């Protein structure tokens, strides 16, 4: 006798309906065909033990079972239940007339109970597309599958309940009903962390707001204890809420990976994934013997946070380059190829040097220039080119923490972000696959973020002086477009520039002779200058762009070749009055001579004379005599 039952196989996000065919003839054997993996081949032993322990008998016959289509690879233990039901129906123990109306999936324990399986949500979507009357799943999976409307989902605890249901005794069974919209919307804004708890750090909040509004990638650089991780963990609270379609797509990925807890329905908040820096390439991007989604796919429509970025394996970081650009990941094997979506915001944090205190005014950095350079070289230029915004973060002094008022709540920031995203949704409504500024193509950048002549002039100067790549040029315009959307402007109009990052200024400082930079670094001397800057929206974007030079290649041979002219003629800086500058520098020299070797003061004075010669100070400025400061 030949009997057919129905189940489904999940490969990536694609689900294929599987016809389970069982034929019984005289004999004593069991054959399973259809390209199943080891778990599928072991199903015969689980089924036999489960039937025996529930008072049923495994048929003594020549059993041939086939999983069609036979050319498609089947993975997992979810075929236990449809195989067991088909075998019983072929033996005449249960009627087969209802098998064509229901799709079955579930793993059998040896005592006959049903265990949860992965990928039930996409299977439920497939069952509805196939116009099945219902879906029978393990009890632990019923809430997950019931979010699919117009499909009766029955959660069963054991195979005996399934047999009773298929025999027509369904008075004791009712489909699971979930109010999808109510459950989804009532949990959207239930956040445990809020930006109102953060005192100070307004510039970092601004950078996170711009990143959230445009979907831009971001990196935060600062010493230990400055609040990098704390700020990153609060980022989901200002992101725009998930739409139902985004939530369904995100929940499917987590269902396939087996990350949904029992009784969990739709994911209502954007995912926030924070893998440890020891993570492997396969765990990050996905794959394995039975390819599963990695962290980048689990962060789809959400945030992937890489804490202590340089501590990650360099080769592991390099595999992020293609997903960051294409927003999907393709896992290729000899016999099949699987594609998972990977549209996420990449947020990273890092220390500026191995000890963590380079540039910190309250601590002394003990790292040599070579150590700092090697530390920064762990992050490649192509990866940095894919990070739109960088932000320096410094610890908030205790007096500021104690006096500062509570910060702006996440709800207020989120409102501005939502308004900016709404403008972008309206702008790109006719363009499939593009929802925010970070997803713009090069053609769209020229259409929606083209600067005027003054803006082009500013960009040209930035490209030449900061040595930006073509990809960085496009990302400047994307960030500029986002800032304009936050301000409610359709055009990139003049605006007061935001405070440039100290490390952006270090790019200009890098143009000085190499030996001067090294001497300044050794004696701990800092230039004293006031930044006066006005520009366009894209001026703020230039300040935010991430490039190789941003991470301080101030000790490279390029700096020595460039000479001091580029730094001298910088359009971004102007020094304060000579009198104030000399007073501040003299104080630094005095302080330096007290904490370093005696020659430090002479080195600092030599630097002052060099700067006066380069016309950065008026010739009339008097320099202190080295002997007057002690030896």
What are these regions (language model features)?
Residues 171-210, 214, 245-296:
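P-loop NTPase nucleotide-binding/switch module
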Residues 307-308:
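Walker B catalytic acidic pair
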Residues 39-44, 59, 66-76, 290-291, ...:
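Basic, amphipathic alpha-helical bundle interface domains used for macromolecular binding and assembly
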Residues 220-259:
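Walker A/P-loop
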Residues 510-537, 560-566:
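Positively charged N-terminal leader segments that act as targeting/secretion signals
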Residues 1-219, 223-226, 332, 472-473, ...:
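Peripheral, non-AAA+ core regions of ATP-driven protein-machinery
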Residues 533-534, 540-548, 553, 561-586, ...:
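Low-acidity, Ser/Thr- and Arg-rich intrinsically disordered low-complexity segments
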């Amino acid at each position: 006798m030949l009997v057919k039952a129905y189940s489904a196989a999940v490969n990536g996000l694609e689900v294929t309906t599987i016809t389970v065919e069982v034929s019984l003839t005289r004999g004593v054997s069991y054959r399973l065909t259809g390209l199943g993996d080891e778990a599928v081949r072991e199903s015969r032993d689980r089924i036999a033990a489960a039937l025996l322990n529930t008072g049923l008998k495994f048929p003594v016959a020549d059993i041939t079972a086939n999983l069609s289509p036979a050319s498609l690879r089947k993975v997992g233990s979810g075929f236990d239940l449809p195989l067991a039901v088909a075998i019983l129906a072929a033996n005449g123990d249960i009627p087969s007339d209802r098998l064509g109306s229901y799709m079955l999936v579930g793993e059998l324990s040896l005592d006959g109970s049903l265990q949860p399986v992965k990928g039930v949500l996409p299977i439920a979507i497939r069952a509805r597309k196939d116009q099945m009357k219902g879906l029978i799943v393990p009890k632990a999976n019923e809430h997950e599958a019931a979010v699919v409307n117009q499909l009766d989902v029955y959660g069963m605890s054991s195979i005996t309940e399934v047999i009773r249901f298929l025999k027509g005794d369904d008075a004791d069974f009712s489909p699971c009903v979930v109010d999808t919209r109510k459950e989804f919307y009532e949990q959207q804004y239930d956040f445990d962390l809020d930006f109102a708890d953060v005192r100070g750090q307004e510039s970092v909040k601004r950078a996170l707001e711009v990143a959230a509004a445009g979907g831009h990638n971001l990196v935060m650089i600062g010493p230990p204890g400055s609040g990098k991780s704390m700020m990153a963990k609060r980022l989901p609270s200002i992101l725009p809420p998930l739409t139902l379609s985004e939530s369904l797509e995100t929940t499917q990925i987590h269902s396939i990976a087996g990350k949904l807890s029992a009784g969990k329905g739709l994911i209502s908040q954007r995912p926030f994934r924070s893998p440890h820096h020891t993570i492997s390439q396969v765990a990050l991007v996905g794959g394995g013997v039975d390819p599963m989604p990695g962290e980048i796919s689990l962060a789809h429509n959400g945030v992937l946070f890489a804490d202590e970025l340089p501590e990650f394996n360099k080769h592991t970081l390099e595999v992020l380059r293609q997903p960051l650009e294409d927003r999907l990941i393709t896992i290729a094997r000899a016999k099949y190829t699987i594609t998972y979506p990977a549209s996420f915001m990449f947020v990273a944090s890092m220390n500026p040097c191995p000890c963590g205190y380079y540039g910190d005014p309250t601590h002394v950095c003990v790292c040599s220039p070579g150590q700092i350079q090697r530390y920064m070289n762990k992050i490649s230029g192509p990866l940095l080119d894919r990070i739109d915004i960088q932000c320096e973060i410094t610890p908030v002094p205790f007096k500021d923490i104690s006096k500062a008022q509570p910060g702006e709540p996440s709800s207020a920031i989120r409102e501005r972000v939502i308004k900016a995203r709404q403008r972008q949704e309206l702008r790109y409504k006719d363009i499939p696959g593009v929802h925010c500024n970070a997803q713009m193509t090069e053609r769209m950048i020229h259409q929606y973020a083209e600067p005027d002549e003054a803006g082009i002039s500013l960009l040209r100067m930035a490209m030449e002086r900061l040595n930006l790549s073509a990809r960085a040029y496009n990302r400047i315009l994307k960030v500029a477009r986002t800032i304009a959307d936050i301000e409610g402007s359709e055009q990139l109009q003049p605006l007061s520039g935001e405070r440039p990052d100290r490390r952006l200024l270090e790019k200009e400082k890098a143009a000085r002779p190499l030996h001067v930079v090294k001497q300044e670094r050794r004696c701990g001397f800092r230039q004293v200058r006031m930044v006066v800057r006005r520009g366009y929206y894209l001026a703020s974007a230039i300040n935010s762009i991430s490039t190789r030079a941003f991470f301080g290649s101030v000790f490279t041979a390029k700096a020595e070749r460039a000479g001091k002219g580029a730094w001298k003629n910088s359009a971004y800086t102007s020094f304060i009055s000579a009198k104030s500058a000399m007073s501040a520098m003299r104080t630094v020299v005095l302080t330096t001579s007290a904490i370093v070797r005696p020659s430090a003061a002479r080195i600092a004075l030599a630097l002052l004379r060099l700067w006066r010669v380069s016309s950065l100070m008026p010739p009339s400025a008097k320099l202190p005599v080295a002997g007057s400061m002690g030896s």
